[in-house]
Amino acid sequence: MKKRYSDRSLVVSFVFVAAASLSSPVSAVEFTGTGFLTIAAGRILGGNVKGTNSTGYNCPCEISDYSQAAIYESGGIKFGPDSKIGYQGQATINESLSFTAQAVSRGAQNGKTDLEWAYGSYTITPETTLQFGRKRLPLFYYSETQDVGFSFPWVHLPPQTYGWEAVNYNGLNLLHKGHLGSWATTLNTFVGSELRRNDPYQYIYSGKKYRIDTEWSDIIGAEYLLSHDWIEGRVMYMQSKTRNNDIDSGNGWGPKKRQQLWGASLMLSPDDWVISAETLLTRRKAYGGDFAASFSIGRHFDRWMPMVTVAKYRQNVNINESDPVLKERHTDVSFVLRYDLTSSSDIKVQLDNWRDQSNPWFSSNYGYSKLLTISYDMVF
């Protein structure tokens, strides 16, 4: 994958931080950081598609992360798709200004290191913060921590919900924290754009060696979070324009099309129980839309936590229904057992049972499958 961040946004961020640091004593700059690691292994246990599919993957196979084209292929134990290592560093310039960067090396991208975050934070008031640079798109509950395996119960997040062409953006966001009665609230508004060159997401549909750029421009959105005791709720709306550049065909950039996304999350943790639900709806002009949802229930038994998850994806198409790539539909039922080794490390075992109800193209290339994965996660 080539450069996946905006030079302009990073230069602006660095210039802003450098200018601020010149007005502060060098000794006042405080550097902190934390690392994270996931070592994962998986094996395909079965599936209905045999041999190399039309996109170059050896099947039976199963997608664990659409955004990174993380796919477990048949032929023994695979370590690449979900393994990763990363580091997040922060430089605090003064009480008002800090700068954060995060780099991640993924097995799904053959160890290539990408700069996922690079943003500055300026505290306007104790409740309000302006951030600028490169950040995660806040599409889901675990969006900000989706690279940190220790932060969530699964070996890999439910691919039916956590899987889109773009996961980051370059721009601005304004965070405001407050209270609504006894409830804590956070309002996050954001604007920006994303250009993802040689987008791995497109490999799944066009092939491992086929190059397509993805652009989301004129991004504007907001998310609102409420929390009280063991209840957390979240709603999100985002709109943008989207287009692709089919490099290998030589057709260039396609026309920009408007898209809208609505998301909602609910997290409940009464006593030792963990219950979560997420959904995302999309609408794209001259295309149709998508529906994605997942529901999980688990329970803590001291250091152990078993969990079951049902995740669904449905593609709703209103044009060009003869296109064999359209109308993708599938359900994944997963069983996870997590054991916390320490306060900063765990091991997990996950069994996925992927059931496909898609069009002939997707069914003949991916179909249904069973996948067993195990991981060791830690933060340091």
List the predicted regions and their residue ranges:
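N-terminal signal peptide c-region/cleavage motif recognized by signal peptidases
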Residues: 18, 23-25
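Outer-membrane beta-barrel pore domains
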Residues: 121-123, 143-145, 235-380
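Bacterial N-terminal signal peptides that target proteins for export
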Residues: 2-12
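Transmembrane beta-strand segments of Gram-negative outer membrane beta-barrel proteins
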Residues: 28-67
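Flexible, solvent-exposed coil segments and beta strand-coil junctions
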Residues: 63-68, 94-100, 106, 148-156, ...
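Signature for the C-terminal beta-barrel architecture of outer-membrane proteins
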Residues: 30, 60-61, 124-130, 165-304
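Residues that define the transmembrane beta-barrel architecture of outer-membrane proteins
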Residues: 79-85, 112-116, 166-170, 216-220, ...
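Outer membrane beta-barrel
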Residues: 30-32, 40, 74-194, 225-228, ...
